Every structure is written in structure tokens, then in C-alpha cells.
């Protein structure tokens, strides 16, 4: 069903390329997972390009759980413990402890404050003391191998921003409807059209990587 709805956004390969182009232009992307998985759409942005206005949009239309997707190397650089030692969540979502910038924020809740926290966490020279714990930004550790290892929004975010040429760090938040329910594919696509965002699925990204990477290794 989703593939029929998605045809307006191009072929699977076109959808990935349009998503990468949007990220390079500083725009957001809507990422859908499988209908048989969470069946949710997440707004994602390249962390280093995200604006206050985009963070405000994310907070206004999202679940309120603004996540910063990072690699294991970045988690270690920041000395962020995992939220739990025994992860029993259904999809193994890898939350670390929450964070707040140590400098330049007030309560940490505003769009500006959350973006300040994101920027503190992704700085090249970021160190553990640059962040307070807990806070209002939720880091997520991506699994090595990206969507080829785990078909989650976290891994899709890292793959997309990396393929777009940015450092491997991205912001995501689940899109919700006005009544507080989770947005499904039709609502995600309507939101994407309204805000001029491309739509891509995790399945698209898996196919894109599988098609490209053997060729790159052969070259």
C-alpha cells in the first residue's frame, strides 16, 4: 500500500537521491519505516545544518522526543552511558542518557536551547564536560553497518546524512497528528508535501546501499 502512495515521490532510487539533495540544501526529510514494523514517519535533519526554525517545527509537529543520532565512537568521545544496561525495548532502540549543553542554555527546553545542545554534542572537539546529564535531548546510538545491520530510523538517519556528505550525526523526531496519535504513511506524505520535504523509506535506503556498495568495492 505504501509503495502505491509513495510513487508520487519517485522511484526508490530517486527518493533516496532527492533525500540526499534536500539534506545538502539544509532541508529536512521524512523517513518511513516498514508497514509491518513501527509504521511511523520521522522528520530528520543533518545535525550540523539544522536551524532553530527547523527545531521549532520538529517540536511543534513531533512527539516532543527530539533525538540526536550518533555513532558509537561519538558516544565514547562524550562518555555517554547507555540509558539501560539490559535493553528490553521491542526494537532495541539504543538510547543513551539524556543531555543538555553545559553552557549557553537556560531551561534546555526551547528550540534554541535544544539546538545549542545538539551543536555542543557534535562539535569536533566535544568532550564529556561540555554536556550535562540528564537533559532534554535524547541521543540514540546507531548500530555499525547502518540500515544493512538494523532497519531503524536511527541507522537510516546516520546513513542518509553520511551519504549526503555530512558528519555522522542527525536529529530525528517522530511525526504526530494534531490529536496526538502517530502519523502513518498518508499523514506523513501530506506533511511532506506541505513542508516541501522529500519522503524516503528505510527499504529504499537498503536497496540503494546494496546497489551502490558492491560497485564501489569493485571500483
UniProtKB/Swiss-Prot annotation:
Domain of life: Bacteria
Transmembrane segments: none
The enzyme's E.C. designation: 4.1.99.12
Pathway: Cofactor biosynthesis; riboflavin biosynthesis; 2-hydroxy-3-oxobutyl phosphate from D-ribulose 5-phosphate: step 1/1
Pfam families: DHBP_synthase
Binding-site residues, Mg(2+) 2: 38, 153
Annotated site location: Essential for catalytic activity: 136, 174
Catalyzed chemical reaction(s): D-ribulose 5-phosphate = (2S)-2-hydroxy-3-oxobutyl phosphate + formate + H(+)
Protein task: Catalyzes the conversion of D-ribulose 5-phosphate to formate and 3,4-dihydroxy-2-butanone 4-phosphate.
PANTHER family for the chain: 3,4-DIHYDROXY-2-BUTANONE 4-PHOSPHATE SYNTHASE, GTP CYCLOHYDROLASE II-RELATED
HAMAP family referenced in this protein's UniProt entry, alphabetically: RibB (MF_00180)
Name the UniProt record assigns to this protein: 3,4-dihydroxy-2-butanone 4-phosphate synthase
Amino acid at each position: 500500500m505504501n509503495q502505491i502512495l509513495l510513487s508520487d515521490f519517485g522511484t526508490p532510487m530517486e527518493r533516496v537521491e532527492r533525500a540526499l539533495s534536500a539534506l545538502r540544501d539544509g532541508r529536512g526529510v521524512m523517513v518511513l519505516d516498514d508497514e509491518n514494523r513501527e509504521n511511523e514517519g520521522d522528520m530528520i535533519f543533518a545535525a550540523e545544518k539544522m536551524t532553530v526554525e527547523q527545531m521549532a517545527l520538529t517540536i511543534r509537529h513531533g512527539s516532543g522526543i527530539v533525538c540526536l543520532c550518533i555513532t558509537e565512537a561519538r558516544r565514547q568521545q562524550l562518555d555517554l552511558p547507555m540509558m539501560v544496561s539490559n535493553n528490553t525495548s521491542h526494537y532495541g532502540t539504543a538510547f543513551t542518557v539524556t543531555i543538555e549543553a553545559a553552557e549557553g542554555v537556560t531551561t534546555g527546553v526551547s528550540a534554541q536551547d535544544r539546538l545549542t545542545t545538539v551543536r555542543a554534542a557534535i562539535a569536533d572537539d566535544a568532550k564529556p564536560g561540555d554536556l550535562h546529564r540528564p537533559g532534554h535531548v535524547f541521543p540514540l546510538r546507531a548500530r555499525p553497518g547502518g540500515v544493512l545491520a538494523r532497519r531503524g530510523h536511527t541507522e537510516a538517519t546516520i546513513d542518509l546524512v553520511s551519504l549526503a556528505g555530512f558528519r555522522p550525526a542527525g536529529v530525528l523526531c517522530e511525526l504526530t497528528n494534531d490529536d496526538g496519535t502517530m502519523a502513518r504513511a498518508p499523514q506523513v506524505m501530506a506533511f511532506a508535501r506541505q513542508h516541501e520535504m522529500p519522503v524516503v523509506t528505510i527499504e529504499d535506503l537498503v536497496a540503494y546501499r546494496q546497489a551502490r556498495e558492491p560497485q564501489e568495492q569493485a571500483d
